[in-house]
């Protein structure tokens, strides 16, 4: 569960990008956040793992399986590091190492679980390799395991990035415009991957997305932002012309 209670964010130049954000996101939801560029979508996501600090209000995260409780404004040091290990973060950039194989790229998600010399030299235990291979298998990417990342298409590279995120074994995935650089067919495939992970693994997923049609097709809930405020929060079927006008204006 993620609780935003009257959250505000003001940049040093005085521009307020989040205004009185109050919402609750429950375990197992697939939430699409939509709105114009500059509406506050990316800032909202980056407050969850404290990449962006908030100016006022509170954000509380509870992970049911581990019973870990985080008050974000008070979370720092090792506890913040522990929180970030539980949250998979994706963006429109693939962040793959071009001259490494797909498997090597996915294994990078396991670096934080290594200790001592193993962490320095990049030696991974059998257990970590099985986790990485299982993540590739979930996305039907096993056949690409020993192919270099720079030999893949953009859609395949984004799916490798998703496999790497899965290998992190997160409780929550937040994705910032993960399909913005993809053509419609590949964008649908990646969104379908998110949907399958959400349903089969029970991982909560929050996605910033410009494609309203994809938000309506794959999300269980849509949040619309306009000028830093929540102006829509409902199931996709309620996203009618009136709601779109609130989110995007005339």
Curated annotation (Swiss-Prot):
Record-annotated disulphide pairs: none
GO function term, MF aspect, one: ATP hydrolysis activity
A GO cellular component annotation in the UniProt record: plasma membrane
EC assignment: 7.3.2.2
One Pfam family per UniProt: ABC_tran
Residues annotated as binding ATP: 35-42
Residues passing through the membrane, by range: none
Catalysed reactions, semicolon-separated: phosphonate(out) + ATP + H2O = phosphonate(in) + ADP + phosphate + H(+)
Listed Gene3D superfamilies: P-loop containing nucleotide triphosphate hydrolases (3.40.50.300)
Cellular compartment(s): Cell membrane
Record NCBIfam families: ABC_phnC
Subunit record text: The complex is composed of two ATP-binding proteins (PhnC), two transmembrane proteins (PhnE) and a solute-binding protein (PhnD).
Protein name per Swiss-Prot or TrEMBL: Phosphonates import ATP-binding protein PhnC
Organism: Mycoplasma capricolum subsp. capricolum (strain California kid / ATCC 27343 / NCTC 10154)
């Amino acid at each position: 569960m993620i609780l935003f209670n009257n959250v505000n964010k003001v940049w040093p130049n005085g521009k307020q990008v989040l205004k009185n954000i109050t919402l609750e996101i429950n375990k197992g939801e697939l939430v699409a956040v939509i709105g114009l560029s500059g509406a506050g979508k990316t800032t909202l996501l980056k407050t969850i793992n404290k990449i962006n600090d908030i100016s006022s209000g509170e954000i509380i995260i509870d992970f049911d399986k581990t019973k870990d409780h985080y008050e974000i404004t008070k979370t720092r040091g090792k506890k913040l590091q522990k929180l970030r290990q539980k949250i998979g973060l994706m963006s429109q950039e693939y962040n793959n190492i071009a001259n490494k194989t797909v498997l090597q790229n996915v294994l990078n998600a396991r670096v934080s679980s290594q200790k001592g010399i193993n962490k320095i030299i990049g030696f991974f235990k059998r257990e970590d390799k099985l986790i990485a291979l299982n993540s590739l298998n979930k996305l039907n990417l096993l056949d690409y395991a020993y192919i270099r990342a720079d030999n893949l298409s953009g859609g395949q590279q984004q799916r490798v990035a998703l496999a790497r995120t899965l290998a992190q074994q997160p409780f929550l995935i937040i994705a910032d415009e993960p399909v913005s650089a993809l053509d419609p067919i590949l964008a649908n495939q990646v969104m379908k991957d998110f949907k399958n992970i959400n349903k089969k693994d029970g991982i909560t997923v929050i996605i910033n997305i410009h494609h309203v049609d994809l938000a309506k097709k794959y999300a269980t809930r849509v949040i619309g932002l306009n000028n830093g405020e929540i102006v829509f929060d409902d199931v996709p079927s309620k996203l009618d012309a009136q709601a779109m006008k609130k989110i995007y204006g005339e």
